[in-house]
Amino acid sequence: MQIPDCKDNSVFIRPNFWYDIQNTEKKYAHIIMIATKPDIIKQAPLYLELKNRWELVVLVHTGQHYDYNLSKWVLAEFGMDVDVNLNIYWDIHKKYSLIVERLWDFLVSIYNDYKKIPVPYVHWDTMTATTADKAAFLNKFAVVHVEAWIRTFTPSKKFYYNLFEKYEKGKFDWEKYYKDLQDFDIYERWSIEPYPEQFDTRAIEWSTWFFAAPVKLYEKTLIFEGFPKEHIKVVWNTVADAIEISKQKMWNSTAFEKFPNMKWKPFIFITIHRRENTQKKERFLVIYNAIKKLIEDWVYVCFLGLYASEFAIDNYGLRKDIEKLKEKYKKNFAYGPALAHHAEVIDMISKAWAVVTDSGSMQEEANIVWVPCVTFRFGSDRTETILAWTNIVAPPINSRLMAEIVKWAISNKKMINKNHLYWENVSKKIVDEVLRMLKKNWKLFKFDDERLELWRFFDWKI
């Protein structure tokens, strides 16, 4: 499979694409939007489900993550062929505008010139989702929001003041902290972290016709915010389907060849990439030194150098230090690049004794493979995993406290729940519901007179 790189910054449309569109009798074009690696992994089961039903599926990649490790291998891994590469570039504000502009033109063409009704599937809380939905909505096409209403729940200022004051006095009680995080009343919902994703997910909701909620908690909060119940369905999370696919390929994983000193060891698997953690020096130094303390205390640590954490290590002058750690702690420390294949990631985290991350999707994956998770944030946009006792936040303020929280979590049996939260056959549930809605409504965009079915009362006579 070839994934074209468009060096002239133009939009790429695969050969014969428009011919194929013109020669199909299908009425709806199911447009799967992807960009980041988690996007691809979680949208892959939907793409495959629609393909298996012989629906007209169009895979649109924004093009911003065409680094081989971030995109190409995982596309090939799931058998996904890109139809349209929007090939966006430049800084983040330019990327926002380019997605809207280029997808807009594509949607107008597929609708006006080829008479296909676009049904865009946007995922999660990404820049791709919050721009693709605008291109659709402004052309009177509503979207299917996969993993809808992802909100961060953060313990209050009072809760954290109490935590840090007690820790400074030597009175930290891990068991009490772990239990206190189960109290739903301690949480606030106004965090802008992860940034800018918490803006993105909120900005998508008004363009959405079908909310594919990953857990019941989000169904309740969507209804609380005023969205109609009949447009919301708890379908669980497509990551569960993706993991089932990847488990079948783990036999071919070479992950432990890349990190041989972790094989058969009680290691922790670490990834850090969030902007607020890597672009804010104080926070990254706290996180880095928490990891360093774990290494120096002879905990087995596998730390993946993602693009953002690599940037931070260089930007804050830590490159020599991490190289010294690699040399001094060869037995218990591994540091290397991101794993290209999802099956390799699942192979490693399923054998880890804990996952330490600031990633939302990895919190879910840890829950599914029955491994304790420690989230290096102040709150979580996967609060359901905390309330299910399988995840604990380690706020990036005090390195020693963070390291202590991680040590308590390693292979903690209380944090292993073999009834994971995200079920199975999720993509089937989503496609079933979308096709049912299309059959009933024929399109996923309606003004109020249509939505309220008031057409029989129209009367423009004087």
Task: Label every PLM stretch briefly.
Residues 1-304, 308-462:
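Nucleotide-activated sugar donor-binding and catalytic core shared by glycosyltransferases
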